[in-house]
């Protein structure tokens, strides 16, 4: 069960339910529970609600009527204290180290912002920082890169109506790895033959070059996010 594009290895599964048009896999799970008239306990409702809330940014991006229906039906079943603890968790100092690196390395090319984290221990941090940097004034697309356990990790966010993040991710990562996503969000992975700094820098340069060419920004001089 997933809401991302079908992967090659997924096609070999005996049973598959993949709906790329949905904003969250939790919405699909909710429909299964509803169809079987399963009573949804408070903790499960809270978990499913948070999944939809975070994936769609409170129905602000990549949502469907099914996502909205699940969101609205689950909301009154939630435990607000647990939900608050999930949405406002305590974070280790290393978490803020990654944010610091992202801000320092971020470069602006017109309406696009690109940042690199290099070595990370959790691939989700790339997406979190990409979400955060979408708040920069004048920025319509953010792409983040990192290296985690032998793989290059990419995350893309966009508010530009004419840019489909999933299609753009597939274009820039073609021949290097796998990727895809939705209209406003996308992710990708690149298997790294070498993890030394020079290889990571070379990969970053290639991906940035492809992205800027695809966006028509290859002649734009970059400027740092933080002067």
What are these regions (language model features)?
Residues 4-71, 208:
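Short alpha-helices
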Residues 54-227:
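Hydrophobic helix-and-loop "lid/oligomerization" segment in the mid-to-C-terminal part
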């Amino acid at each position: 069960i997933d809401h991302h594009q079908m992967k090659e290895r997924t096609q070999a599964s005996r049973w598959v339910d993949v709906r790329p048009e949905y904003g969250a896999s939790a919405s699909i799970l909710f429909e299964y529970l509803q169809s079987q008239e399963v009573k949804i306990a408070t903790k499960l409702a809270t978990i499913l609600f948070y999944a939809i809330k975070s994936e769609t940014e409170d129905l602000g991006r990549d949502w469907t009527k099914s996502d909205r229906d699940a969101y609205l039906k689950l909301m009154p079943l939630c435990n607000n204290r647990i939900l608050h603890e999930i949405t406002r968790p305590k974070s280790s100092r290393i978490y803020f180290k990654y944010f610091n690196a992202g801000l320092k390395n971020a470069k602006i090319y017109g309406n696009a912002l690109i940042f690199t984290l290099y070595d990370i221990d959790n691939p989700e941090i790339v997406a979190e920082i990409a979400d955060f940097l979408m708040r920069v004034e004048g920025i319509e697309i953010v792409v983040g890169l990192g290296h985690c356990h032998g793989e290059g990790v990419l995350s893309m966010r966009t508010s530009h109506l004419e840019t489909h993040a999933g299609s753009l991710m597939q274009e820039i990562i073609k021949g290097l790895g796998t990727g895809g996503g939705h209209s406003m969000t996308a992710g990708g992975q690149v298997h790294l033959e070498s993890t030394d700094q020079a290889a990571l820098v070379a990969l970053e340069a290639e991906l940035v070059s492809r992205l800027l060419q695809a966006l028509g920004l290859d002649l734009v001089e970059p400027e740092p996010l933080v002067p």
